[in-house]
Every structure is written in structure tokens, then in C-alpha cells.
């Protein structure tokens, strides 16, 4: 029995990791929003102006008045 586990456990772990990596790649390539978000983020570096705009939008959304 130990001889079986000597090769089965490493093979099982490698196959499990490959399946998880493949599943993640499928989600990345077949989910349209993920690729566009990643491309936009890599196009240009984040500047202070963008950070301030993001914080302002976040504050306005979080602490906005009640909608009537």
C-alpha cells in the first residue's frame, strides 16, 4: 500500500493544480469583463489625479443623500 501512495499523491496534487489553473484560465478568457478591466489597468500607470477622482466618487456613493 505505501508504494501506491508514493506515486499517487504527487500525481494527484499535480493533476489537481493543473485542473484549477485550467479552470481559472477558462474563466479569465471566457468572461468578457475581466479582460477589458485588466487591459485598461495595464495601459497606463495610476496617477494622483485618478486616485483623487476614485476617492471622490467612492465618498459620494457611500455618503450620498437619500434618494427621493
From Swiss-Prot:
Localization: Nucleus; Cytoplasm; Membrane
Primary location recorded for the protein, binned into one broad class: nucleus
Expression sites (tissue/organ): Highly expressed in brain.
This protein's GO CC annotations: cytoplasm; membrane; nucleus
This protein's UniProt keywords: Cytoplasm, Membrane, Neurogenesis, Nucleus, Transmembrane, Transmembrane helix
Transmembrane segments: 7-27
Membrane topology: Single-pass membrane protein
GO BP: any one term: neuron maturation
The protein's role, per its UniProt record: Plays a role in the regulation of neuron maturation.
Name of the molecule in the record: Small integral membrane protein 45
Organism: Homo sapiens
Lineage: Eukaryota, Metazoa, Chordata, Craniata, Vertebrata
Gene behind the chain: SMIM45
Amino acid at each position: 500500500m505505501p508504494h501506491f501512495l508514493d506515486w499517487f499523491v504527487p500525481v494527484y496534487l499535480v493533476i489537481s493544480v493543473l485542473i484549477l489553473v485550467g479552470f481559472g484560465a477558462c474563466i479569465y478568457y471566457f468572461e468578457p469583463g475581466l479582460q477589458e478591466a485588466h487591459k485598461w489597468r495595464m495601459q497606463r500607470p495610476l496617477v494622483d489625479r485618478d486616485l483623487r477622482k476614485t476617492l471622490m466618487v467612492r465618498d459620494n456613493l457611500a455618503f450620498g443623500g437619500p434618494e427621493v
